[in-house]
C-alpha cells in the first residue's frame, strides 16, 4: 500500500468519518496525527491508540506529515491545509484515503441517502457472525465494536460510502449496497436527475464479477436500476424482489426477550426462514435484509446470518435509549431529513408508547429551506412537537429561513400546534411537563440535540420527586 509513509495527518480528526479511518491506520501500524477544535471522547480514544492530537488548527501541526487528509467540512483557507500546500505536502480527501484502504481489499460499500450507518453495521455483524472477520469503517459508534472502526484479519472491508459530496465515486469495491435515493444534499446536486446520474455511476463502479444490492421499495431507486450495467440483486416488501420480505408480529415471548421486529425472507422463491431484530421499524427490516443479501452472496449460512442479526444491538444515535425516569423513555435519534423522521416516528409508534413527544433540531438552513414542505408533513405520528433553532453546521443564515417559519408551515399543513423552544433548557421543561408515565420523549436531529437527553431526564426526575 503506502508503506513508506511515516506520518499521516488528519484535519478534523474527531469527525465521525475521519476518526474511523484514523483508527484503522493506527491499528495497521501507521503514525497518525490530527487536529480538532476541541477534545472529545473520540479524540481521547485515538490518543489512547497512539495518535498525536492537537487542539485547534495551526500551521505548525502539519510539521513532519507526509500526507494531509481532510473532510468536506474543511476548506482551503484552513491554516494546516494552506501550510501543506505551501510545502508541497499532498492534501487528499478522506475518500481518497478510504479508497486506498479498500483498493487491496475485498470491499463492500454501503451507500444511500438514509440508513447507511445501520446497514453498514449490520453487514459487518453478518460477516463477523460468518467468521469472515472484516475490517469495518462506519459513520457511527457501533455497540458491538465499542467504536466506529475495527481492523479485521481477513481481506474483507465493509465501509460506509459518503454521497454527500460525491466522494463515494472515488472508492474501490466488489459489492455495493444502495438503500435509497432522495432529495438530499441539494447543495451538492443540481436536481434529482443529477442525484440519479451520480448513483448510476456509483453502481456501475462495481466490477463485472461483483453485485449491486438495491432496495426495491424505494421508487426513485427502482426507477434507475434499468440504467445500471452491472448484476443487480433487489430486496424489499415489493413483489418481485429477489429477497422478498414478509413481516410477522412478534409474539409475547419474543417481545419479553427484547425483540421488536420479526420477519421472513424468501430468496427467489426459496425460504431463508424467520429473522428477529432488537431494533424497531420497517426501515431496519429493510436494512437487515440488505445485510442478508450480502451474507447469502458470500455463502454465509442462513443460521449464522440469523444469529448475527438477532444479537445486533444498534448504533449510537439511532433510536438510542438515553434513559428512563418516571416510566418515561427518553430516546435520541440522528434523523434530520423528512424521510428519516417519518421512519423513526413509525418505529416509535410500533413500540407501543402512550404518547410520543418530539424535540426536533433542524439541521442546516439550506435543507430547511429546500425541504420546508416535506418537513411540514413529516410529524404526523408525533403527539406534541417542540422545535429548536436551526443547527447551522457551518452555514450562514438565510433570510426568512428559521424555526418560526418552519413552525408556521407545519401548523398550516398539518393543523397541529407546534411550539418554538428558544433554548435547550426551555425544550427540556416543555417536553418533561407534557410527558406522562408510559410516554416517550424523542430528540431528533444531526446537530448537538443529543446533549439534551440528560437535561430532560433531570427534569423528569425532579417532576417525579415533586409529585411525591
From Swiss-Prot:
InterPro entries membership: Mur-like_cat_sf, Mur_ligase_C, Mur_ligase_C_dom_sf, Mur_ligase_cen, Mur_ligase_N, MurCDEF_pg_biosynth, UDP-N-AcMur_Ala_ligase_MurC
EC number in record: 6.3.2.8
Positions bound to ATP: 112-118
Subcellular location: Cytoplasm
Main subcellular location of this protein, as a coarse class: cytoplasm
First-level EC class: ligase
One Pfam family it belongs to: Mur_ligase
SUPFAM superfamilies listed in its UniProt record: MurCD N-terminal domain, MurD-like peptide ligases, catalytic domain, MurD-like peptide ligases, peptide-binding domain
GO CC field: cytoplasm
Physiological role: Cell wall formation.
Similarity remark: Belongs to the MurCDEF family.
Stored PANTHER family: UDP-N-ACETYLMURAMATE--L-ALANINE LIGASE, UDP-N-ACETYLMURAMATE--L-ALANINE LIGASE-RELATED
Name this polypeptide is given: UDP-N-acetylmuramate--L-alanine ligase
Organism: Koribacter versatilis (strain Ellin345)
Amino acid at each position: 500500500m503506502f508503506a513508506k509513509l511515516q506520518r499521516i495527518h488528519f484535519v478534523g480528526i474527531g469527525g465521525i468519518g475521519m476518526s474511523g479511518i484514523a483508527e484503522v491506520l493506527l491499528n495497521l501500524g501507521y503514525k497518525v496525527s490530527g487536529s480538532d477544535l476541541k477534545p472529545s471522547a473520540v479524540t481521547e480514544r485515538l490518543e489512547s491508540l497512539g495518535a498525536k492530537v492537537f487542539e485547534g488548527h495551526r500551521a505548525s501541526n502539519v510539521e513532519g506529515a507526509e500526507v494531509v487528509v481532510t473532510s468536506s467540512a474543511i476548506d482551503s483557507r484552513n491554516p494546516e491545509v494552506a501550510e501543506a500546500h505551501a510545502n508541497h505536502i499532498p492534501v487528499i480527501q478522506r475518500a481518497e484515503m478510504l479508497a486506498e484502504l479498500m483498493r487491496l481489499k475485498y470491499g463492500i460499500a454501503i451507500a444511500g441517502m438514509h440508513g447507511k450507518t445501520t446497514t453498514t453495521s449490520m453487514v459487518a455483524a453478518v460477516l463477523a457472525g460468518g467468521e469472515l472477520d472484516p475490517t469495518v469503517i462506519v459513520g457511527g459508534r457501533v455497540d458491538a465494536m465499542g467504536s466506529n472502526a475495527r481492523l479485521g484479519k481477513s481481506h474483507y472491508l465493509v465501509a460506509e460510502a459518503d454521497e454527500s459530496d460525491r466522494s463515494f465515486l472515488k472508492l474501490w469495491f466488489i459489492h455495493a449496497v444502495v438503500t435509497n435515493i432522495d432529495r438530499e444534499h441539494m447543495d451538492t446536486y443540481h436536481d434529482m436527475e443529477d442525484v440519479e446520474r451520480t448513483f448510476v455511476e456509483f453502481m456501475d463502479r462495481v466490477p463485472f464479477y461483483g453485485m449491486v444490492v438495491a432496495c426495491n421499495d424505494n421508487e426513485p431507486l427502482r426507477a434507475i436500476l434499468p440504467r445500471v450495467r452491472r448484476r443487480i440483486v433487489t430486496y424489499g416488501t415489493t413483489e418481485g424482489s429477489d429477497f422478498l420480505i414478509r413481516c410477522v408480529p412478534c409474539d409475547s415471548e419474543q417481545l419479553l426477550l427484547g425483540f421488536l421486529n420479526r420477519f421472513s425472507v424468501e430468496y427467489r422463491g426459496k425460504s431463508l426462514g424467520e429473522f428477529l431484530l432488537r431494533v424497531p421499524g420497517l426501515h431496519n427490516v429493510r436494512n437487515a435484509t440488505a445485510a442478508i443479501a450480502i451474507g447469502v452472496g458470500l455463502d454465509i449460512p442462513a443460521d449464522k446470518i440469523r444469529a448475527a442479526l438477532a444479537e445486533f444491538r444498534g448504533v449510537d444515535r439511532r433510536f438510542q435509549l438515553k434513559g428512563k425516569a418516571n416510566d418515561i423513555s427518553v430516546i435520541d435519534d440522528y434523523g434530520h431529513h423528512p424521510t428519516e423522521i417519518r421512519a423513526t416516528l413509525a418505529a416509535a409508534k410500533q413500540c407501543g408508547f402512550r404518547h410520543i413527544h418530539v424535540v426536533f433540531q433542524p439541521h442546516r438552513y439550506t435543507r430547511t429551506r429546500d425541504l420546508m414542505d416535506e418537513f411540514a408533513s413529516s410529524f404526523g405520528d408525533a403527539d406534541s412537537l417542540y422545535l429548536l433553532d436551526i443547527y447551522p453546521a457551518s452555514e450562514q443564515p438565510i433570510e426568512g429561513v428559521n424555526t418560526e417559519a418552519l413552525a408556521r408551515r407545519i401548523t398550516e399543513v398539518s393543523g397541529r400546534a407546534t411550539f418554538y423552544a428558544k433554548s435547550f433548557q426551555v425544550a427540556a421543561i416543555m417536553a418533561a411537563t407534557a410527558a406522562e408515565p408510559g410516554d416517550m420523549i424523542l430528540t431528533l436531529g444531526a446537530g448537538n440535540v443529543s446533549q439534551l437527553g440528560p437535561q430532560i431526564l433531570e427534569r423528569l426526575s425532579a417532576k417525579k420527586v415533586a409529585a411525591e
